[in-house]
Amino acid sequence: VFLLSTFMDIQGQVVAVKTNVLYDAITTPNVGAEVAFNKHWSVEASGYYNGWTFSSDKSFKHWMIQPEARYWIHERFNGHFFGVHAQYIDYDFAGLKLLYGMEKKNSYNGNAYGGCISYGYQLYVSPRWNVEFTAGFGYLHFEYDKYAFPRGDAPIGKFRNEYWGLTKAGISIVYIIK
């Protein structure tokens, strides 16, 4: 009971919803929710989905989830925070030159998962609205089938790739519910 009371405020939680406008700008709708349990700790989970095929030769289909635990330096939803987050991505990319060694001449169908640390800052705008800036760095493990593009019947092969670097970037509009 003592350990539980250390992390949870008996007076109630504060809840916020948000959207990351950087992902909105690349046509990936997203929504996040964050619950603060006391003055310094919160948990956040965001989901992202892009089901678009841009043309017969370009596709950026994917969905992603990102849960995160955050420690707020001053107080919840105000100022600096540090976080630890996990990430899972399921994707089907085609005809695009992407990071991680993926070439435009191929298409890729697979998933990635990993863990990361993050830093961010929430800027107070009004009692209900904030703007959040965040970046995360860490590790992602990719597993995918690689196809000749346009996609042939059989994959060229199954591949794995390890990535260390930027894993999260965000400028989010935050609405505080309670």
Residue ranges, per PLM feature:
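Membrane-embedded beta-strand positions of outer-membrane beta-barrel proteins
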Residues: V17-T19, A33, A45, P67, ...
